[in-house]
């Protein structure tokens, strides 16, 4: 077991890396890169704010932002106040204006959208914690439909929280082993991202002990699962569709060999789409097949692998599943009921377009993306779209996730809070503004972004921020 500073790099692992690394890269540089702290990076959420507006907004903070070459919304970030104020406690993060995302993990989604077209139906097979799902949603501009699947039950809640914070309403969440989708949803998706579970050899800069229990045998076992996952994903992909396969590991068995296995299995139905032109400088990580094999010393980021494939023809379907999905517990609202909901929502500043449809379950009113409808009855969804409201005393109790997703920036009915008042809001406390709004139900904003819906009670604004989101400790204190 070799120890390099605080980083554990087993000798057998280094042997595998020597074999996997192209001739133009040096092992000494690889080891040195593994010992350097990982640079922090963020991605601007363009569903909330444009990149230019974000840069102008944070300019007074003194943040040093270096563009990520493969993601126009991505930046490496250096901050003088990093020790005093966690990045996740800044106002911009709390309101969903950016996502903390490792730079190399922005690569798979960049590859998925490399042709400039916007797919209508997308699946993210292993979605938690949500960095890539939220990146996909932003590039789709909240249109179409994304099936975001996560096998780990404990991570589904985090996935939903991140989707909600970013104001996304075109996602349906599922909780399955990713190997079910080829049979359950054959040829249903225009684009699929399989960021596969892997041995994590590329994340050692984030976790110095990530490789302490590494073994070649575990790589082979994981690769066997990856082949089953990529086969299932390929069956779920429509002819003409794009499949991006990625990992945060570096050995060939889980990367090139997994893709080659798929190419050999369906030689007449799949082709490689080279990533040579994905961004200036991509050639430094390009393999002879057209994949990107990113060793950490190339771009000073985590290790990663990305392959982009096109399905050129249908393949023989897998046996149809025998399970029963169960009755769908929602019914679409009738026209008159829908009109009443739309009118009431507009009075408080919530609006949406015709790509979202109103559905009801008991006293809950939901908004589902139109593109979700064909999937009803085919698999069970944990949740879809956004919960808009609950019917309450012949009126509506608007839900936090709906306000964050639908109110938009610069809402004319929004009530702008001061920095101190916004901090109180995030701490779950009522706000006592100097001037009181006219409306009883009011969207409170900060930096012109919706924070939630408050109810006026006398001269105070009653806080409705969800208890599970309440923040303690130091919150944003940067100039505004």
UniProtKB/Swiss-Prot annotation:
<dbReference type="InterPro" id="IPR049560">
    <property type="entry name" value="MeTrfase_RsmB-F_NOP2_cat"/>
</dbReference>
<feature type="binding site">
    <location>
        <position position="195"/>
    </location>
    <ligand>
        <name>S-adenosyl-L-methionine</name>
    </ligand>
</feature>
<dbReference type="GO" id="GO:0070475">
    <property type="term" value="P:rRNA base methylation"/>
</dbReference>
<keyword id="KW-0949">S-adenosyl-L-methionine</keyword>
<dbReference type="InterPro" id="IPR001678">
    <property type="entry name" value="MeTrfase_RsmB-F_NOP2_dom"/>
</dbReference>
<feature type="active site" description="Nucleophile">
    <location>
        <position position="248"/>
    </location>
</feature>
<comment type="function">
    <text>Specifically methylates the cytosine at position 1407 (m5C1407) of 16S rRNA.</text>
</comment>
<feature type="binding site">
    <location>
        <position position="177"/>
    </location>
    <ligand>
        <name>S-adenosyl-L-methionine</name>
    </ligand>
</feature>
<keyword id="KW-0698">rRNA processing</keyword>
<dbReference type="InterPro" id="IPR011023">
    <property type="entry name" value="Nop2p"/>
</dbReference>
<dbReference type="GO" id="GO:0005737">
    <property type="term" value="C:cytoplasm"/>
</dbReference>
<dbReference type="InterPro" id="IPR029063">
    <property type="entry name" value="SAM-dependent_MTases_sf"/>
</dbReference>
<protein>
    <recommendedName>
        <fullName>Ribosomal RNA small subunit methyltransferase F</fullName>
        <ecNumber>2.1.1.178</ecNumber>
    </recommendedName>
</protein>
<dbReference type="Pfam" id="PF13636">
    <property type="entry name" value="Methyltranf_PUA"/>
</dbReference>
<keyword id="KW-0963">Cytoplasm</keyword>
<dbReference type="Pfam" id="PF21150">
    <property type="entry name" value="YebU_pre-PUA_dom"/>
</dbReference>
<dbReference type="InterPro" id="IPR031341">
    <property type="entry name" value="Methyltr_RsmF_N"/>
</dbReference>
<dbReference type="Pfam" id="PF01189">
    <property type="entry name" value="Methyltr_RsmB-F"/>
</dbReference>
<dbReference type="InterPro" id="IPR018314">
    <property type="entry name" value="RsmB/NOL1/NOP2-like_CS"/>
</dbReference>
<keyword id="KW-0489">Methyltransferase</keyword>
<dbReference type="InterPro" id="IPR023267">
    <property type="entry name" value="RCMT"/>
</dbReference>
<dbReference type="InterPro" id="IPR023545">
    <property type="entry name" value="rRNA_ssu_MeTfrase_F"/>
</dbReference>
<dbReference type="Pfam" id="PF17125">
    <property type="entry name" value="Methyltr_RsmF_N"/>
</dbReference>
<keyword id="KW-0694">RNA-binding</keyword>
<dbReference type="InterPro" id="IPR048457">
    <property type="entry name" value="YebU_pre-PUA_dom"/>
</dbReference>
<dbReference type="GO" id="GO:0009383">
    <property type="term" value="F:rRNA (cytosine-C5-)-methyltransferase activity"/>
</dbReference>
<keyword id="KW-0808">Transferase</keyword>
<dbReference type="GO" id="GO:0003723">
    <property type="term" value="F:RNA binding"/>
</dbReference>
<feature type="binding site">
    <location>
        <position position="150"/>
    </location>
    <ligand>
        <name>S-adenosyl-L-methionine</name>
    </ligand>
</feature>
<comment type="similarity">
    <text>Belongs to the class I-like SAM-binding methyltransferase superfamily. RsmB/NOP family.</text>
</comment>
<feature type="binding site">
    <location>
        <begin position="126"/>
        <end position="132"/>
    </location>
    <ligand>
        <name>S-adenosyl-L-methionine</name>
    </ligand>
</feature>
<dbReference type="InterPro" id="IPR027391">
    <property type="entry name" value="Nol1_Nop2_Fmu_2"/>
</dbReference>
């Amino acid at each position: 077991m070799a120890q390099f500073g605080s980083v554990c790099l087993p000798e057998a692992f280094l042997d595998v890396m020597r074999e996997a690394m192209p001739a133009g890269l040096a092992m000494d540089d690889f080891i040195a890169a593994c010992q350097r702290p990982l640079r922090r990076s963020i991605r601007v959420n363009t569903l909330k704010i444009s990149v230019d507006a974000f840069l102008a907004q944070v300019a007074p903070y003194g943040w040093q932002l270096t563009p990520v070459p493969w993601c126009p919304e991505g930046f490496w970030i250096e901050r003088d106040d990093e020790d005093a104020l966690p990045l996740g406690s800044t106002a911009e993060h709390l309101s969903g204006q950016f996502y903390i995302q490792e730079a190399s993990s922005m690569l798979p989604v960049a590859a998925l959208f490399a042709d400039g077209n916007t797919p209508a139906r997308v699946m993210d097979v292993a979605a938690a914690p949500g960095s890539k799902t939220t990146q996909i949603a932003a590039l789709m501009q909240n249109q179409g439909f994304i099936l975001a699947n996560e096998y780990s039950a404990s991570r589904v809640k985090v996935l939903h929280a991140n989707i909600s914070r970013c104001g996304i309403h075109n996602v349906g969440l599922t909780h399955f082993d990713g190997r079910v989708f080829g049979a359950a949803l054959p040829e249903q998706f225009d684009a699929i991202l399989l960021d596969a579970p892997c041995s994590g050899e590329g994340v050692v800069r984030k976790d110095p002990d990530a490789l302490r229990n590494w073994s070649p045998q575990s790589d082979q076992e994981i690769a066997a699962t990856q082949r089953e996952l990529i086969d299932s994903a390929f069956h779920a992909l429509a002819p003409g569709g794009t499949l991006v396969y990625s990992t945060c590991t570096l050995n060939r068995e889980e990367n090139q060999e997994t893709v080659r296995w798929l190419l050999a299995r369906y030689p007449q139905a799949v082709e490689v789409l080279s990533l040579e032109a994905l961004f200036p400088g991509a050639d430094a990580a390009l393999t002879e097949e057209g994949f990107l094999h990113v060793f950490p010393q190339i771009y000073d980021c985590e290790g990663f692998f990305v392959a982009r494939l096109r399905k050129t023809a249908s393949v023989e379907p897998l046996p149809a599943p025998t399970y029963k999905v169960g009755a769908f517990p929602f019914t679409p609202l009738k026209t008159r009921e829908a009109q009443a909901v739309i009118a009431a929502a507009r009075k408080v500043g919530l609006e949406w377009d015709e790509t979202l449809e109103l559905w009801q379950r008991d006293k809950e009113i939901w908004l589902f993306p139109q593109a979700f409808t064909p999937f009803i009855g085919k698999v069970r969804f944990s949740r879809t779209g956004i919960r808009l409201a609950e019917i309450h005393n012949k009126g509506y109790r608007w839900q936090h996730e709906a306000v964050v997703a639908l109110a938009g920036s610069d809402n004319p009915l929004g009530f702008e809070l001061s920095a101190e008042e916004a901090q109180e809001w995030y701490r779950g406390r009522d706000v006592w503004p100097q001037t009181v709004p006219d409306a009883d139900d009011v969207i409170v904003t900060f930096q012109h972004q919706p924070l939630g819906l408050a109810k006026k009670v006398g001269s105070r604004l009653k806080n409705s921020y969800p208890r599970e989101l309440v923040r303690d400790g130091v919150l944003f204190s940067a100039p505004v």
